[in-house]
Structures are given as structure tokens and as C-alpha cells.
């Protein structure tokens, strides 16, 4: 009996020490993308998917301060132990799920619309991630297959950067450097890529600003 108690105590201690993660999903058939899943680890590793069985997820690294800020908001939300749904009669904006995992500890809450200020703040951050990865996918496609469309893709990226909507901007650097150094792209595209590359290397606003 004492052995079983010791085993359970050890398992509980391991679960408490396990690194936490946050999982956000949104299902909204008819929208683009119709489904997203974003997993954020405590150390800032992030995985973005547009299908449950996505074979080519986007993986990136958040700045430590950004990851810390996001997990701080999750703590304010009591690790999703309480409901966030407003209950108001509003239009369908997609089923969102916030999920907290740490060892055997799992909490999640689902909602269409929330009036909770911290819940809305966290949702807005995840929406920024979705917007950012859509811009990344668009730019990557243009760089590879549509050189004349690169400048337009960069204009959109620049606009979102000016609005402080970009998350983990350094993920764009390999693409931007490829454009700025390659004379086969339009001169204006190369100039814009160089300017964005310099700006992204200079830092960005905090995740929850």
C-alpha cells in the first residue's frame, strides 16, 4: 500500500513539474482558413496547422517575453477552468477552444463570443498569429512561384507590420533576405524586402500590446 501511495505521489509530482502548453483551435466552415490549430509551449515553440492532420505545419519560435506574456494571460483566465462564452445572441463567428495542458492536468473552454477582457486579449493574439501565418504562406508562395506578385505580398506584410499585427516577425527573414539579394525580383520588391528585413531585425512590440 505504501508503495502505491509513493507511486501516485511521484506521478502527481511529475505532472506538476511537466511543462505546460496552450492549444487554440477554431472551426469556422466557409471561412478561410476553415480550421486552425495553434499549440504554444512554455519555451515559446509554436506549431500552426490548418487541418487536424496537417502534414506540413508551420513551426516557429516566439521571443521569451512574448511566450511569458501569453502564459501570464492564461493564468489570469484560471487556466480555462471557467467559461468564457458570453451567452449573448450574436452571429456565428466560429467555435473557438482554449485548452491548457500540463501532465495529467487538462482544462478547456469553448466559445463563440466572449466579453471577458483577458479572454478577448488572448483571442486577439491568436488571431494575429493566424493573420501572420497567412501572410507568410502568401509571401512564400509568391517568392517561389510568382516573382511579379512578391511586391504585392510585401505591401500586405508591411501594412500588417505598421498595424502591429505581426507575431514572431523573424520567421520572415529568410524569405526577405532571399528577395533583397536576388536581382531577378523587381527593384521595388527588393527595396521593400530590405526595409522590412531591417525593421524585423530591430525588434517588435510585445505580444499582448
Question: Across the structure, where does each feature detected by a protein language model lie?
Answer:
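Short, well-ordered, aromatic-rich surface patches in folded extracellular/luminal domains
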Residues: 16-28, 80-209
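Short beta-strand/loop motifs in extracellular/secreted proteins, especially
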Residues: 36, 44, 96
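Charged, amphipathic alpha-helical segments
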Residues: 66-87
